C-alpha cells in the first residue's frame, strides 16, 4: 500500500496548536516545504477538524460540526463546502462510516469534480495512522466519541473495532458515558453503582436521570448526550470505586483493539489518540498494557499528508489508502 516514502520523523516533538489562525510549524514529519496549499479534514463524532498546510506550516485551522458518513445527512455537500471554502490546491479527508472502497472512490471523484481540485478520501483510521507515524509502520488506536484501531506493517493493513455505537465502540466516550448512566441508574435501583457517581451524572447532564433517559431514547443517534458524560468517570476515578472500574474497563477495551491488530500484523509500535486517551487515568493504564506513545501529529495533519501524497501518485491518487478496507468508527 503506498505510504509517503519520503516523509521522515526526525524527532519526537508533539504537534503544537498555538491558536486558531496563528501559523505553527509542523513536527518534522514533512520533507521540507511542500508545493501548494494542502487541506486536511479529519471528520469525527465529536467535531470535524480542518487545517491548511503551506510551506511546512499550519497557516489556518478550524473546528466544524461532527460528521459521519452513516449518520450525517448531506455529508457530500458539507464536505464540498469545507473544501471550496478554503484556498487549497488539494484536499485529503478522513471520514468515519464510509463502508466500502467503492463508496470512497465515488465520493472522492464527486468532490474532485465539483470542487475543481484533487480531493482524496479515506477512513478516519488511516489518516490517524498517517498523522501518528507518517511513513513508518505502526498501530493507531483512536478513542473519541467512537473507538477503533488501524495498523500498517509496511505491506498489509489491519483494523479492529470501529463498528459504531450500536454494535461496538467499546472504550469510547459514548461507551463510558453510557456506563456512567447505567451505574447511576443501578444505584437508584439499589443494585450497585454509587451515590457520588449518580450525583455527578445528574450535575453534568443538567437534568434528573428520568429526563436524561427519556432524552436518550427520544434521540438515540445523538451520541453527544452520553459521550459528554465521559469526564464524569475520569474526574471521579481517583475517589470513586465504580468510576475507577469503568475507566479501567475502558482502557482494557482500547488495549484489546491494539492487541487484535498486533495479532494480525506483529509487534508494531502503538500510538493512542482522541479525547478519551487524553484523560490521565485511562492513558496510564492503556500505556501499561500496550507501551503506547503519543502521536507526532494529529489526524488532520495525516489528512493533509494524504492530500500531498495523492497528488504525487500517478493515475488516480493514493489508492492504498482510498481503497484499503471497510471503516465504521470515528
What are these regions (language model features)?
Residues 2-87, 132-139, 181-330:
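ATP-binding/phosphotransfer module of carbohydrate and carboxylate kinases, centering on a glycine-rich
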Residues 40, 122, 142:
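Generic enzyme active-site microenvironment
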Residues 63-68, 83-121, 132-133, 219:
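Short beta-strand-loop/turn "lid" adjacent to the catalytic site in phosphate-handling enzymes
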Residues 92-99, 143-146, 267-278:
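Glycine-rich beta-strand-to-loop/alpha-helix junction loops that act as flexible
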Residues 105, 145-159, 230, 279-289:
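Acidic-glycine-rich active-site phosphate/pyrophosphate-binding loop
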Residues 111-118, 157-164, 286-291:
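Glycine/charged-rich beta-loop-alpha catalytic/anionic-binding loops adjacent to active sites
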Residues 122-123, 297:
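Short loop/edge segments at beta-strand edges and connector loops
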Residues 136-187:
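Glycine-rich phosphate-binding loop of actin/hexokinase-like ATP-binding domains
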Amino acid at each position: 500500500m503506498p505510504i509517503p516514502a519520503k516523509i521522515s520523523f526526525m524527532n519526537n516533538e508533539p504537534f503544537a496548536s498555538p491558536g486558531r489562525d496563528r501559523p505553527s510549524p509542523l513536527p518534522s514529519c514533512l520533507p521540507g516545504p511542500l508545493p501548494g496549499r494542502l487541506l486536511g479534514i479529519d471528520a469525527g463524532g465529536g467535531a470535524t477538524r480542518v487545517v491548511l498546510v503551506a510551506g511546512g506550516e499550519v497557516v489556518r485551522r478550524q473546528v466544524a460540526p461532527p460528521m459521519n458518513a452513516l449518520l450525517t445527512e448531506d455529508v457530500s455537500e458539507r464536505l464540498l463546502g469545507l473544501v471550496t471554502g478554503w484556498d487549497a490546491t488539494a484536499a485529503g479527508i478522513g471520514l468515519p462510516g464510509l463502508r466500502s472502497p467503492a463508496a470512497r472512490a465515488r465520493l472522492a471523484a464527486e468532490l474532485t469534480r465539483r470542487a475543481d481540485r484533487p480531493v482524496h478520501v479515506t477512513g478516519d483510521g488511516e489518516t490517524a495512522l498517517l498523522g501518528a507515524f507518517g511513513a513508518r509502520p505502526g498501530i493507531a488506536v483512536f478513542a473519541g466519541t467512537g473507538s477503533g484501531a488501524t495498523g500498517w506493517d509496511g505491506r498489509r493493513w489491519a483494523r479492529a473495532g470501529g463498528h459504531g455505537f450500536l454494535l461496538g465502540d467499546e472504550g469510547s466516550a459514548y461507551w463510558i458515558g453510557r456506563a456512567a448512566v447505567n451505574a447511576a441508574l443501578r444505584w437508584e435501583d439499589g443494585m450497585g453503582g454509587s451515590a457520588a457517581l449518580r450525583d455527578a451524572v445528574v450535575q453534568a447532564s443538567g437534568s434528573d436521570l428520568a429526563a436524561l433517559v427519556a432524552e436518550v431514547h427520544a434521540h438515540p443517534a445523538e451520541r453527544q448526550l452520553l459521550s459528554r458524560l465521559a469526564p464524569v468517570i475520569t474526574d471521579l476515578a481517583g475517589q470513586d470505586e465504580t468510576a475507577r472500574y469503568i475507566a479501567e474497563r475502558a482502557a482494557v477495551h482500547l488495549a484489546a483493539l491494539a492487541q487484535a491488530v498486533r495479532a494480525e500484523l506483529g509487534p508494531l509500535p502503538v500510538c493512542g489518540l482522541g479525547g478519551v486517551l487524553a484523560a490521565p487515568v485511562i492513558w496510564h493504564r492503556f500505556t501499561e498494557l500496550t507501551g503506547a506513545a503519543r502521536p507526532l501529529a494529529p489526524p488532520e495533519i495525516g489528512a493533509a499528508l494524504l492530500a500531498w501524497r495523492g497528488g504525487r501518485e500517478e493515475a488516480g491518487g493514493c489508492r492504498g489508502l482510498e481503497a484499503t478496507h471497510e471503516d465504521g468508527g470515528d
